[in-house]
Amino acid sequence: MGNSFRSDRVAVEIQREINDILRNKVRDPRVQDVNITDVQLTGDLSQATVYYSLLSNLASDNEKAATALKKATGLFKSELAKRMTIFKIPDLTFAKDESVEYGSKIDEILTWA
């Protein structure tokens, strides 16, 4: 149980730091509208899945953002190493958060009802 609490705390810290790095360090216009919505860590803190949402619904924008995030993974890891006090920075994997789109569809259905 204690390990879960620690991984949750580290995940929240990683989410906050990556959002800050996106706003202040990454100059790539492809990630301008990206927002980090969640981070899921493995129990041993070696892997982190970083979920992001995008303001644009265009498939081309989504692909560009995914490419830019993958390209900036090294920058994220090096900045996290400077900012965080954990022994090993987890390997980062970026995944689009589909729950935002799902919520929008539910809202749309409810407004039609």
UniProtKB/Swiss-Prot annotation:
PROSITE patterns: RBFA. InterPro entries: KH_dom-like_a/b, RbfA, RbfA_dom_sf, Ribosome-bd_factorA_CS. This is Ribosome-binding factor A. Keywords: Cytoplasm, Ribosome biogenesis. One of its GO terms (cellular component) is cytosol. SUPFAM superfamilies: Ribosome-binding factor A, RbfA. One of its GO terms (molecular function) is ribosomal small subunit binding. Pfam families: RBFA. It comes from Lactococcus lactis subsp. cremoris (Streptococcus cremoris). Belongs to the RbfA family. Its main location: cytoplasm. It comes from the Bacteria. Monomer. Binds 30S ribosomal subunits, but not 50S ribosomal subunits or 70S ribosomes. One of several proteins that assist in the late maturation steps of the functional core of the 30S ribosomal subunit. Associates with free 30S ribosomal subunits (but not with 30S subunits that are part of 70S ribosomes or polysomes). Required for efficient processing of 16S rRNA. May interact with the 5'-terminal helix region of 16S rRNA. Gene3D superfamilies: 3.30.300.20. One of its GO terms (biological process) is maturation of SSU-rRNA. It is found in: Cytoplasm.
